[in-house]
Every structure is written in structure tokens, then in C-alpha cells.
């Protein structure tokens, strides 16, 4: 290494003293791509666990964990009638698990996978590049999708609300928002 100002090493490589007699092509090894695997579910999260959302539009809300999707995201719901959180996907890094559990018997989550939450993209109008508008067909499909979503939300919430009503104060607990004050120490709290 050559030394530069103030005695620091600079990235200059020396030429080797000896040269190979035969020029041989050195084999080029490609890196093996890692297979995408679903994120492992945290130990403290199990179906029926009440989670606190830490980021996003619903931060501070308490939700019920239903299942883990193939992508590794968590499927959660408020229930919507209690605290306004619909069926949604959440990354488990942005959740805080509590010791509270809800009985999920009768809740059917088989139809909910990652494609259920997909949307149709709006086509850009070539005349006006800044506005992307849905066609009439896409608008009809979107309204049908929204109506189906409402029915699915109701189908999940009905047995869930029945289970919530069985436990005293659980409905109020789910409806209340999670907050911290200045002197609170979250690492010492038990949720």
C-alpha cells in the first residue's frame, strides 16, 4: 500500500514481481441467489393474540391477529365495528404483542391471501400524463370489490365480536388507543 498525506493508506495495489508463464482464464463463480422464504413468525405472536400497531394510519390501535400470509405479513382486524381497523396486512416488525388472547373459533380466514388485497392499476391517459383514471369497467369492478370486501369484513367480525363480548372489558380494551407518557418506560412494561 502506498502512503498518502498524513501517513494514511491509499488503495493502490502493487504489481506482482512474478508473471505466470501461461495465461489461464480464471473461472468466474456466480453467486447463488438465495431462495425467498416466508418470514418466520415471532414466538410471542399466535392466532388470536391482540397486537398494538406501531406505525401507519392505525398506529396505537389494538387489533386481533388472525393468521400469517405466505408473504410473511400478518392478517389482522380491529374488529372494524369496535375500533375502525379493517382486515389488513401488517409487517410483524411494526407490531407489539400483548398477553391478551381472543378465541377465534368460527372465524374462517381461508380465502384471505396476498392476492385478495391486490388492486387494479389505473391506466394513464396519453393526452394528460399527470392524471391516471380508471375506465368504466375498472370502476364497476372496483365497486364490486369494495362491496365484497364489506361482506367479508362482516363475515370475519361476526364470530369475532361474539368472542369479544364473552370477555368482560375486552371490547373497551380493543377500542382504546395505546399511548405512552413522558415518564413511561415501555421496556419495563408487561403488555
Curated annotation (Swiss-Prot):
Q: Which SUPFAM superfamilies match?
A: Translation proteins SH3-like domain
**GO MF assignments:** RNA binding; structural constituent of ribosome
Question: Which biological processes are named by the entry's GO terms?
Answer: cytoplasmic translation; ribosomal large subunit assembly
- Matching Pfam families: Ribosomal_L6e
This protein's GO cellular component annotations are: cytosolic large ribosomal subunit
Instruction: State the UniProt keywords alphabetically.
Output: Ribonucleoprotein, Ribosomal protein
UniProt xrefs under PANTHER family: 60S RIBOSOMAL PROTEIN L6, LARGE RIBOSOMAL SUBUNIT PROTEIN EL6
Give the family from UniProt: Belongs to the eukaryotic ribosomal protein eL6 family.
Q: State the name under which the record lists this protein.
A: Large ribosomal subunit protein eL6
Organism expressing this protein natively: Tetrahymena thermophila (strain SB210)
